[in-house]
């Protein structure tokens, strides 16, 4: 008997989000226009589910990125995120290397979880998704694992669960430590967002909100049919 057969249906990651593999992402940029402004930093964390159906952070990648040729650089954005694009200690790589590395990590995790496609999870996710997709288009990296427009927005989810939409406030509500001095570092914000998303998914499970009774009944019917065949 395989591991997936031994683990209950709803405790398998591939069955939690309709076949989607969730990947937490945060970006730091030189503006708000994904087509014109530079992508300067990107971090991503994949997730795994244990045999009891609880979600946990898993693999991570993090890149400082060189502005693409002709990119706009908004000084106000650099002042906000504290990035010095001329600092040689950044160890910045090209967009091509960053997106290639991201996609490779995500595809491996997606395959290991037996998921059909990956989906971006981010705080105010439209922003992060737009920059990832624009960079993928610029670089021409093939086999983009992400859904082209679907996403999970932790700002919306936290607003529903806690009445808080700001990341630090949502983390505080979930009793997740948050160091404001490290905020606006893509890696730190991704780590906090990953913990927040896992907390919300796991807390919903603890409250009895998942699996929903209707989906449980449907799964029982499916299992009965398979057993009868």
Swiss-Prot record:
SMART domains: EXOIII (SM00479). GO terms for cellular component: cytosol. SUPFAM superfamilies: Ribonuclease H-like (SSF53098). The record marks 32, 80, 127, 149 as: Important for substrate binding and specificity. Residues 23-197 form the Exonuclease domain. Binds two Mg(2+) per subunit. The active form of the enzyme binds two Mg(2+) ions in its active site. The first Mg(2+) forms only one salt bridge with the protein. Its cofactor is Mg(2+). Keywords: Exonuclease, Hydrolase, Magnesium, Metal-binding, Nuclease, tRNA processing. One of its GO terms (biological process) is tRNA processing. NCBIfam families: RNaseT (TIGR01298). This is Ribonuclease T. The lineage of its organism: Bacteria, Pseudomonadati, Pseudomonadota, Gammaproteobacteria, Pasteurellales.
